[in-house]
A protein has these predicted regions:
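Amphipathic alpha-helical recognition patches that constitute DNA-binding helices
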Residues: 104, 108, 121, 149
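Conserved active-site alpha-helix within GNAT-family acetyltransferase domains
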Residues: 120, 145-163
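Conserved hydrophobic beta-strand within the GNAT/NAT acetyltransferase core sheet
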Residues: 107, 138-143
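Active-site acidic-Proline motif in GNAT/NAT acetyltransferases
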Residues: 107-116, 146
Length: 186
């Protein structure tokens, strides 16, 4: 099983669980309580919608413990003097890596929290998580051609444009080096 939580300077990034996804989908008033964070007014953000949540829940249900950490992740802004812990984004992997170590990520940040570097930090956390597994060698991401903010987030995280993709999207990719402790067997 891979680690199910990672931290960045401003974010706690937590792997989705069946309990969290079930609450988010079917008991939204319990969701922030289970998550331990306030919700933004415009939740869910971007392309992170009920269909994505249902897919992630189905994959976690079918895959059991081995699927944990390979689908959705919640980005919680850490508490400070001005705000409690707050859910600011969602992202994650579209599944475990393939046989050659390629995995795909996606991400979305709530509108109220955009423009503060949190998308960049979320993607950095996902890259960190991918490296920590020791299983991922390359990450892919896709962004709409007109979503310049997403392009910048990916570029700031060392993704490179890799050409057009389906549905008017651009493909980005980057190499991933396994974390040192994985290489050392620590």
């Amino acid at each position: 099983m891979i680690p199910l939580i990672t931290h960045t300077l401003h974010l706690t990034i937590l792997a989705a669980s069946r309990a969290l996804l079930t609450a988010e989908l079917h008991k939204p008033h319990y969701f922030p309580i289970l998550l331990g964070a306030a919700l933004p007014t415009d939740w869910p953000p971007g392309d992170y919608d009920e269909a994505v949540m249902e897919y992630q829940l189905d994959q976690l249900t079918a895959g059991g413990r081995s699927a944990a950490g390979w689908y959705g992740w919640y980005a919680l802004r850490k508490a400070d003097d001005t705000a409690p812990p707050t859910l600011v984004g969602a992202g994650g992997f579209l599944g475990p890596p393939d046989a050659v170590g390629t995995a795909e990520i996606d991400f979305a940040v709530a509108a109220d929290w955009r423009g503060q570097g949190l998308g960049t930090e979320l993607v950095a956390g996902l890259v960190q998580q991918a490296a920590a597994t020791g299983m991922v060698r390359q990450l892919l991401a896709h962004a709409a051609t007109d979503n310049l903010a997403a392009h910048q987030v990916l570029l700031h995280n060392d993704f490179l444009p890799a050409g057009p993709a389906a549905e008017g999207r651009l493909r980005f990719d980057r190499a991933v080096e396994p974390a040192a402790d994985i290489l050392l067997g620590a």
